[in-house]
Amino acid sequence: MGTHRIFIGLIALCCFCLPHLIEAKPFGVYQQQVFVDQSGHGNFTTIQKAIDSVPINNRHWFFINVKAGLYREKIKIPYEKPFIVLVGAGKRLTRVEWDDHYSVAQSPTFSTLADNTVVKSITFANSYNFPSKGKMNKNPRTPAVAALIGGDKSAFYSVGFAGIQDTLWDFDGRHYFHRCTIQGAVDFIFGTGQSIYQSCVIQVLGGQLEPGLAGYITAQGRTNPYDANGFIFINCLVYGTGMAFLGRPWRGYSRVIFYNSNLTDVVVPEGWDAWNFVGHENQLVFAEHGCFGSGANIGRRVKWVKKLSESAIQNLADLSFINRGGWVEDLPIPA
């Protein structure tokens, strides 16, 4: 994830991100339900056409059910189409794939700038650098985003995110990821989102990197000590091939917490890297609490890793970190 490329991407996105003004209607109220089926037995044959059918400034939950299959398309939910619920047949059965690359702003296979987006049981993949049938991809490694999440109050249940570099751009807003699988090798969870990752599987694909090169799981972009954002990983599994740091700072007050998570030996002993902020490590909030596994030995961590108080940890590793107003409980979670 090149900093200059990210900056360019942010400028491009700002042209589309208008203030979030629409609030959710009561739980259970929905306007319409449509089906996407490539065989022609649904309302639409592509996911994007189904999204396009949602009314501008929609104010009720709109369910889009996607049948099993490989969907070769780029998908975008614009900011003016909130309250979309996108449901697949399973993250191994419904897969959306594209191979755009280089620009983080233009490459996402899936992007949502709308508030109140809910996705369940789908995988979004950027295939540009992704290994095929276990074989190493020989394309030059470059940013290739699988998903960009830019709206507030958005949740993802049993969703897959597959890529190598910059897989999941957790761009902005409050987000909840539950039982998701995120695959990558370099900065593959990055951005300035205020997010909880609960019971997720983080798979390091270090075998796609040059021999001896360690990857990076997170690159979080908190810019000052008063920013509320950060990435909180709760009861997650970190495993894979090769080696990886838990994170490095994209901005000077980066905040990432791993809580009660299983860290295997894919995690490098040092745990964290200061990257471009050597000498300013005291500003970074990189912490682990209650983690276990062969990669969780904090005795070999960098000396500047944060030692947070029990009360600070409990405040961060709690749904209330993202759930002001109780929006998570009000989501129309598909069965």
UniProtKB/Swiss-Prot annotation:
The active site is at D166, D187. It comes from the Eukaryota. Residues 1-24 form the signal peptide. The gene is PME29. Substrate binds at R248, W250. PANTHER family: ACYL-COA THIOESTER HYDROLASE YBHC-RELATED, PECTINESTERASE 10-RELATED. This is Probable pectinesterase 29. GO terms for molecular function: pectinesterase activity. Expressed in flower buds. Glycans are attached at N43, N262. Pathway: Glycan metabolism; pectin degradation; 2-dehydro-3-deoxy-D-gluconate from pectin: step 1/5. Its EC number is 3.1.1.11. InterPro entries: Pectin_lyas_fold, Pectin_lyase_fold/virulence, Pectinesterase_Asp_AS, Pectinesterase_cat. Belongs to the pectinesterase family. One of its GO terms (cellular component) is extracellular region. It is found in: Secreted, Cell wall. Acts in the modification of cell walls via demethylesterification of cell wall pectin. The keyword Oxidoreductase does not apply. It catalyses: [(1->4)-alpha-D-galacturonosyl methyl ester](n) + n H2O = [(1->4)-alpha-D-galacturonosyl](n) + n methanol + n H(+). GO terms for biological process: cell wall modification; pectin catabolic process. It is an enzyme of class 3 (hydrolase). Keywords: Aspartyl esterase, Cell wall, Cell wall biogenesis/degradation, Glycoprotein, Hydrolase, Secreted, Signal. The lineage of its organism: Eukaryota, Viridiplantae, Streptophyta, Embryophyta, Tracheophyta. The record marks Q165 as: Transition state stabilizer.
